[in-house]
Amino acid sequence: MTVLIHVLGSDIPHHNHTVLRFFNDTLASTNEHAREFMVAGEDNGFTESCPALSLRFYGSKKALAQAVIAKAKANRRQRFFFHGQFNTSLWLALLSGGIKPAQFYWHIWGADLYEASSGLKFRFFYPIRRIAQGRVGGVFATRGDLSYFARQHPGVRGELLYFPTRMDPSLNSLAIECQRAGKLTILVGNSGDRSNEHITALRAVHQQFGDTVNVVVPMGYPANNQAYIDEVRQEGLALFSAENLQILSEKMEFDAYLALLRQCDLGYFIFARQQGIGTLCLLIQANIPCVLNRDNPFWQDMAEQHLPVLFTTDDLSERVVREAQRQLASVDKSGITFFSPNYLQPWHNALRIAAGEAE
């Protein structure tokens, strides 16, 4: 039997760390197809913190791709599970036959599916990538992303799968200690990445609420982002008074981030694609509604779970927000498909499919 190899093809520290810890802590002990990893980037202590995994690290995306292609050619029975796929060389290998479709299974992370960049090199590459995506052996994704993908590639198998958000199920039934009232606190974006379109989002929040709300913008991740943080702060202060604007430029530990989220009344996410599911889950768990772009297909996942969805095109007010909070509080969180531990069984199914052990 050939053991499935998992590929983290781009150096995205936060997401890669989440995936590796999830596999180490939850899947590896009971499934031999959950232990082998090829990772773009440095070790950064992963080998020590994830002893249940066999990890190989590569200094660049190109070096990793070359190693994957060599393994694929050496053994055509070898299958790979790509977690997110931000590696140009791997898409090209799928097109050229270096990796065969039956060897290539892909968990869509959102940004690797959508064609959001206006850069010339991206506009040139997107059509090529789109053709390659139609040749994969199968995809795993959110309901919304599966729907989006199926419109382009109806012949490719798709299975429901959610990113393994770190969650404490015991908090699902956490009682609201006091009735929410007073000035709203709005979380804008889920990180400091430009894909959050912070400036556009701040303008939209100001247009809806004026300078009457507290605005919190978490920008501690990614690192080396000070110039963009300063740009967002400058624009924010042109819209909101200093006491109503909080730009968080330092990376936060999970418990501190969780505490921050629970101080908010509303999450505002203007990006037009699926991303930030972890933050969305933690907000929903705390009965905090989220505003989504109508072009963000994750609203389909929320609607499927009977969760209230607010859109950036809605007329928002404190009354609307409080009503959404009330509706969220009435939902049985233990049944939400994309919450822990409910997302575990689809992961076991995905491993069997990618390994060729399930029809």
From Swiss-Prot:
It is found in: Cell inner membrane. Catalyzes the synthesis of Und-PP-GlcNAc-ManNAcA-Fuc4NAc (Lipid III), the third lipid-linked intermediate involved in ECA synthesis. NCBIfam families: PRK02797.1-2, PRK02797.1-3. This is TDP-N-acetylfucosamine:lipid II N-acetylfucosaminyltransferase. It catalyses: beta-D-ManNAcA-(1->4)-alpha-D-GlcNAc-di-trans,octa-cis-undecaprenyl diphosphate + dTDP-4-acetamido-4,6-dideoxy-alpha-D-galactose = alpha-D-FucNAc4-(1->4)-beta-D-ManNAcA-(1->4)-D-GlcNAc-undecaprenyl diphosphate + dTDP + H(+). The gene is wecF. One of its GO terms (cellular component) is plasma membrane. It holds the Pfam family Glyco_transf_56. Its EC number is 2.4.1.325. Belongs to the glycosyltransferase 56 family. It comes from the Bacteria. Pathway: Bacterial outer membrane biogenesis; enterobacterial common antigen biosynthesis. It comes from Salmonella arizonae (strain ATCC BAA-731 / CDC346-86 / RSK2980). Keywords: Cell inner membrane, Cell membrane, Glycosyltransferase, Membrane, Transferase. It is a peripheral membrane protein. It is an enzyme of class 2 (transferase). One of its GO terms (molecular function) is 4-acetamido-4,6-dideoxy-D-galactose transferase activity. HAMAP family: WecF_RffT (MF_01002). One of its GO terms (biological process) is enterobacterial common antigen biosynthetic process.
